[in-house]
Amino acid sequence: MDPNCSCPTGGSCTCAGSCKCKACRCPSCKKSCCSCCPVGCAKCAQGCVCKGASDKCSCCA
């Protein structure tokens, strides 16, 4: 158990579905936030938490 995190080591945060995850500070489960990308963009939504659907995404450019 990481002292900085409420989740078990290697597990996922309880706030994994939200971009307001400020309580979790352990690198093992902290994920960055990004807008959800349109269908067909394979580069996005990998290792990040989607904060909402979007027709445009910087990582799909």
UniProtKB/Swiss-Prot annotation:
PROSITE patterns: METALLOTHIONEIN_VRT. Residues 1-29 are annotated as: Beta. A divalent metal cation 3 binds at residues 15, 19, 24, 29. GO terms for molecular function: metal ion binding; zinc ion binding. A divalent metal cation 4 binds at residues 33-34, 44, 48. Keywords: Acetylation, Cadmium, Copper, Metal-binding, Metal-thiolate cluster, Zinc. The modification N-acetylmethionine is found at residue 1. It comes from Bos taurus (Bovine). It holds the Pfam family Metallothio. Gene3D superfamilies: Metallothionein Isoform II (4.10.10.10). A divalent metal cation 5 binds at residues 34, 36-37, 50. A divalent metal cation 1 binds at residues 5, 7, 21, 24. Residues 30-61 are annotated as: Alpha. This is Metallothionein-1. GO terms for biological process: cellular response to cadmium ion; cellular response to copper ion; cellular response to zinc ion; detoxification of copper ion; intracellular zinc ion homeostasis; negative regulation of growth. Belongs to the metallothionein superfamily. Type 1 family. Class I metallothioneins contain 2 metal-binding domains: four divalent ions are chelated within cluster A of the alpha domain and are coordinated via cysteinyl thiolate bridges to 11 cysteine ligands. Cluster B, the corresponding region within the beta domain, can ligate three divalent ions to 9 cysteines. A divalent metal cation 2 binds at residues 7, 13, 15, 26. The gene is MT1. A divalent metal cation 6 binds at residues 37, 41, 44, 60. One of its GO terms (cellular component) is nucleus. Metallothioneins have a high content of cysteine residues that bind various heavy metals; these proteins are transcriptionally regulated by both heavy metals and glucocorticoids. SUPFAM superfamilies: Metallothionein. Monomer. A divalent metal cation 7 binds at residues 50, 57, 59-60.
